[in-house]
Amino acid sequence: MGNILVSLISDQAIPNLEMIKEKPVDAYLFILTEQMKEKLGWLKEAAGLKDSSIIQELIVDAFSFEDIDKKLSAIVSDDHHYLVNLTCGTKIMSLAVSDFFKDIDCELFYIPGKNDSYVRIFPGIKKPYISFKTKITLEEYVLAYGFTIRHKSKLLTSPEQTEKVFNYFLNHFNHEKDGEALKILRKKREDRKSFPHFGDDFEVPGFLTRLQFIPENPDHLTKNEIKYLTGEWFEDYVYSLVKNKYQLSDEEIGVGWQLQKGENNTPNEFDVLYIKDKKLNIIECKTSVMLSGTSFKKNIITETIYKVDSLRNNLGLFAKTNIFTLSDLNESDASIRSSIDRAKEYKITICGKADFQDENFPENIFKK
């Protein structure tokens, strides 16, 4: 007798992925409609199910009890034990599948979405909540929604070094001296051919000294070091801040990811992504203290709104989104007020310089 996990396929990917990880079995039965074939492909990719010999797909009419019962009767055997996940699919699919399997050797499960647990609803009078022993990783999450991971960044230096850089930019940044050094570094960042020695760029060594940043080579910077100094340090800082706050594993959080859904869609870049309470969270990190002018503040917000709207409406991915910036966000400034108001409509949380300087930091930014 073998164990077979039965899953109902719908737009929700995570409940099925959770049960696949939680219940190692001998074979899999997926019940779906014709329209859900692509989503099943994403689920199998995320779960690492590549052996077609242990996978059976049953195409049904999602709104027909008779069709579902007839097709299940043709393939289900009394020789197996069935574990049935009723969380997804249409209501009729769930009811029809539940009615069918109750007359067979089976267990029926449902994932309510609250807490990190699922319910065994059959057999037995009691309906115990059972804690998941496994967790969904960030990579599994995005794969389950059809995304390809094009790039992942890594922390350039230690969290302690990045903490020093953060404190300098937040409290001691000199727009005249440091701003000039950053202009030079940005030009070098755009030069993809080479990154020459400092030469006459005497502003840069002084800037590095004030930051307490020690490069690999004393007289020039690597490409990655220049990227770090011109803004990516803030992504690294927020990554470590969030990871420590929620005690996340390396598999639950990422920095500098580039995701693409389908070859015809433009890749999206994300500064910090993480999974918390089985939900995807995105933080866009912008060190706009380096630049002057309210148009930059506005562009950060509108760019993020566009990205969130595209993810939701075109790519089917919903995430809690935040913008972290070291700019002074003055809502009385007419040039950015409309963008901030629009961000609120999209439930995008914005944390500015004042939030990072607040006496209750960092707890205050996680309560917004």
Question: Where in the sequence are the language-model features?
Answer:
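A broadly used, surface-exposed interaction patch
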Residues: 27-87, 91-106
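Mixed-charge intrinsically disordered linker/loop segments at interdomain junctions
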Residues: 94-165, 169
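Short, aromatic/basic amphipathic alpha-helical patches
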Residues: 19-21, 39-50, 333-346
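Intrinsically disordered, low-complexity Ser/Thr/Pro/Gly-rich regulatory segments
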Residues: 136-368
